[in-house]
Amino acid sequence: MEQRRIEGKSHWYHETQSSTYPHDVLPLVPEAAHVDDSFLLDLALPDDVLSPFQSWLTPARRLAQTLFPAHVNLNQMHTFSAYERMSTALTVAQVYGVQRLCNHYAARLTPLPGPDSSRESNHRLAQITQYARQLASSPVVIGERDRQHLEAVGLTTSDNILMNQIIGFVGFQARTVALFQAWSGHPVRRIPGLDIQQFAHASLFNATKTTWHAAPFPIEKYPPHAENSARGYPDELQALVPLLIHSPVILDLLTTLISAVRRSTVSVQEFSLAALVTSRINGSVACFNEQAHTANELVDVIALLRLDERELQRWEQLHPVECVTLQAVQWLTRAPDRFSTALLTSLFDQGISSEQAINLLAWSGLCGWLNRLKIALGDTD
């Protein structure tokens, strides 16, 4: 579980134990810490390219600033430090292997004061790192025992909500950056040793009628009933609101982000397909069935997605035209570091505009965030 750095904090793969490092150690790319665009991390793109997406890029940038502020105020209910926030972000960035993110979060982590070298602090950081890595790389394995481990090392409900939002956000950020890099024709730069995410086991999806319920977190913040009922939260967030309200600013920005991405010319059917594929890969049965119950026009595809991955591969071989969208969503979900220009070109060849393609694939990245929130913060029966 523990990954050790060769040169202090200067290497992406930070260790989970505190140590004393030389004061002159620098990150691999120190300038990567300083960016004007807190979400796309100064990826060079013409303004006219980004213009159609500013409605959701703006809340995404505000989320980056909110999740990683210059100063973090801690108290009894909010103990997740600036170091733990940035360490979690770097762990997730490492999982997805998008170099721009790894450089940025490594550079920002370097100057932060780490926890003390006590066994308790080391154990807490190790648990946080392991949890972040697992939820990012294989969300289906997360369950009640993992939540208990986090509680045992002192994470409060607010801490837990915040950490899961950070993990979801950085995953969305990694996929969006990979998407725009592919649009720009950047070559794929793979980091050796990173595995592609596997499909969750098909047996989980045998149950077509399921109920998601929130895990029994101690509730530290109760939303006013009138305010809660009046707020127009998206359907995808309704069940999560009693927990996500612990970070109300983040919840409101996530709501704005979801609504903005959905306000595009992409068809409802395409959005549903992307949501189904991501939830099938990530193992979120609750998200999958919620989509399945409303996507009546996708009955055949839904039945196919409930089967083993090999059945889907056979279907794709027989339907090369129809599988183009599936392939793009799959690669962005399973291996954003390998998402290439060729996958976007295949969508364009089917008559999908660049604006539609980017909105659709950004939505699939958001779905991955929502899948992880549902898995991390509750259980499905």
Residue ranges of predicted features:
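Hydrophobic alpha-helical segments
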Residues: 1-381
